[in-house]
Design a protein with these regions (language model features):
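Structural core segment of the AMP-binding/adenylate-forming
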Residues: 15, 58-59, 86-147
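Conserved phosphate-coordination/catalytic loops
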Residues: 10, 43-47, 97, 116-119
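A short N-terminal helical cap/helix-turn-helix that marks the beginning
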Residues: 7-29, 47
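Secondary-structure junction/capping motif
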Residues: 10-14, 41, 147
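Secondary-structure boundary/capping motif
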Residues: 17-20, 39-41, 48, 52, ...
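Conserved AMP-binding/adenylate-forming core of the ANL superfamily
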Residues: 28-74, 78-82, 99-104
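A detector for short, charged/polar N-terminal pre-domain segments
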Residues: 1-6
């Protein structure tokens, strides 16, 4: 690729790499589903997204696999976006405002293999868990105190 405009591929994960390298100390602020404000830096986010990618690989998620998220925007969802796509899988963000039956249909159609869910939507997943055959597991995004 030498002599071209870019000397490396433009990947979604490279956006977070750039932010960590040039704005590593800049704070990212979000409110958690549990209520408190969460603060950390781009460097922290990059590290956690890379750890998430390794954990997904350990769970058997590979390139091209679909990983669904049923979550509000927050730091955990942010890390998923970069961690999942950074390891070559597809981050499938499911609209949490849909009805349970629609969510089940969408997850089946996409053939999602793993679902990350905010506490807010656990009841929805309990309702449809038996209907989403391709899903091998569910990960509830919360801290230990709220399990």
């Amino acid at each position: 690729m030498l002599g071209l405009m870019m000397d490396k591929p433009l990947l979604i994960s490279s956006l977070l790499d750039y932010a960590a390298a040039y704005h590593g100390g800049t704070e990212i602020v979000s409110r958690t589903v549990e209520g408190p404000i969460h603060r950390y830096t781009y460097s922290d986010a990059e590290l956690r997204a890379k750890k998430l990618a390794k954990a997904l690989q350990a769970l058997g998620v590979g390139e091209g696999d679909r990983v669904a998220t049923l979550a509000w925007n927050g730091y955990r969802h942010y890390e998923l976006y970069y961690g999942v796509s950074g390891m070559g899988a597809i981050c499938h963000m499911v609209n949490p405002r849909l009805f349970a039956g629609q969510i089940a249909y969408i997850m089946n159609h996409a053939e999602d293999t793993l679902v990350f869910v905010d506490l807010t939507f656990v009841k929805v997943l309990e309702e449809i868990a038996s209907e989403v055959g391709s899903v091998k597991g569910f990960v509830i995004m919360t801290d230990e105190a709220h399990m």
